[in-house]
């Protein structure tokens, strides 16, 4: 069980980027994760609307969900040519937009509950225009809920601080800065949850 992500090649050079977190651990959760991942890939290929894809996957998971598990998903579609990022949220953490000067903000959530819980749920989509140098962090709650020896969580505010102190110059640097910050905060405390983070960045040549 735990986190997963998929990189899906779509038409017109677009990329589908689902980031997800399954509710449980163990063998049943691992099977549920595999099923969720397969269904997401199939739904993504059939539509360019991330909300429609989540709605389709939710219905399929709910029909067969005898274990009463669920999966939170943030599904984004990025167009490198235009810099447009369209996303839909199923009970997941809000993506973080980081500007070239290091300022950052959480992008608005779109509503929509975790997948597999209930049928007939609508998943609205939202589009943001990335400018050159903009970076978007797609992550799971393993980052925000990472805990140190005093029982404090890393939290969203520390995510903002990571980039305020050192604006990312590329995707690799953004990812390393985030993981280093979490690692330094946690110290020797055992990791209790999966930690997953994807980076979408638009640079001067549209990638």
Regions found by a protein language model. Give the residues of each.
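Conserved subregion of the PPM/PP2C metallophosphatase catalytic domain
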Residues: 1-23, 27-33, 37-207
């Amino acid at each position: 069980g735990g986190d997963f992500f998929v990189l899906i090649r779509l038409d017109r050079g677009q990329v589908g980027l689902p980031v997800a977190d399954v509710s449980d651990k163990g063998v049943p959760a691992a099977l549920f994760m595999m099923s969720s991942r397969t269904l997401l890939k199939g739904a993504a290929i059939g539509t360019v609307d991330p909300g429609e894809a989540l709605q389709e996957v939710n219905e399929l998971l709910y029909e067969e969900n005898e274990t009463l598990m669920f999966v939170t998903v943030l599904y984004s579609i990025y167009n490198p040519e235009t810099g447009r990022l369209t996303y839909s949220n199923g009970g997941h953490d809000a993506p973080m937009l980081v500007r070239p000067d290091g300022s950052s903000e959480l992008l608005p959530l779109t509503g929509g509950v975790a997948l597999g819980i209930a049928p007939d749920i609508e998943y609205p989509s939202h589009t943001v225009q990335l400018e050159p140098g903009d970076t978007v962090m797609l992550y799971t709650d393993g980052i925000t809920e990472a805990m140190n020896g005093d029982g404090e969580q890393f939290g969203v505010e520390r995510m903002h601080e990571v980039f305020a102190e050192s604006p990312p110059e590329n995707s690799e640097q953004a990812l390393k800065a985030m993981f280093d910050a979490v690692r330094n905060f946690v110290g020797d405390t055992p990791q209790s949850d999966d930690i997953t983070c994807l980076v979408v960045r638009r640079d001067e040549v549209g990638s």
